[in-house]
Amino acid sequence: VPIFHFSLTLLCSLLCLTTFYCRANTQGHIPSVRFAVNTPGSAPYLYYDESAKRYQGVVVDFFNADELSSQFRVVYLDSNRARSEDLLKSSSVDLFLSSESWISKPSSFLFSEELIKHESYIYSTTNFEGPFVPEENVSSSICTRYGFVYPALTPYFDREENNIDRVDSSSQSTMAMMLSRGRCDFAIMNEHNARSVMFDPKFCSTEFYQSPNVISRVSLVFVIRSGFTSLIDKIDIALKHFVESGQRQLSFERHSGVNQFPKAKC
């Protein structure tokens, strides 16, 4: 009987060790996918959380969902918008978040289904009397994100006379800070971006107003290196579930809140 118990115990131990090894071995062989981040990111989509010391956002939530997390591991690499295209062409990275209309050579890449409709507005510290019309606001200045493309405003930025002054900044947070301090007359950003930064307590004493009209509307998608069709197929399937299940909506609410403009003083 003691020998039987010993053998049974040994067998169970070996089974446990084998199971543990198989799980560890399986996890160790999950392939990595390299994601280029337009550093320091852009809340609520993808941003670096200083307290947690890692990237957070809707993109992270999407890739951490069960549909994809078991198939590959995402490695987030610091980059910038212009450089990301070159890195993708050279296969140094596998994908990044953008819009097809912002890409210089869209025929060189693959594009996923839409993550979200990206709608940009003009923001001000004073109320708008009506829709924002660029032609009626020449000689003004607009805070922008360095390296970002603004098709609706580019003709006015590029004029030699009667132009609108483009004031570049490194992030949406610094754009809002410059707007609050009068460094520019307006700021342009996506509604989700604006909600995530302008309702921060550091802007407690500032009022922010949103233009009644959308300045630009594009589809935000994952831009994937040419030939990586297996990845785009997996992403598109997961995106459908992410949207239809309500996970996308919950993720946006978690990372940008549910506040509505105008933003009043505290």
Residue spans of the language-model regions?
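A ligand-binding cleft/hinge motif common to bilobed small-molecule-binding domains
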Residues: 86, 98-108, 155, 185-216
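Periplasmic-binding protein-like
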Residues: 39-41, 117-121, 202-240, 258-266
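Ligand-binding cleft/hinge of the Venus flytrap
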Residues: 48-49, 63-70, 135-138, 146-169, ...
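Acidic, polar ligand-binding/catalytic clefts
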Residues: 60, 73-137, 147-150, 211-214
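Extracytoplasmic small-molecule ligand-binding "clamshell" domains
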Residues: 27-107, 168, 235, 255
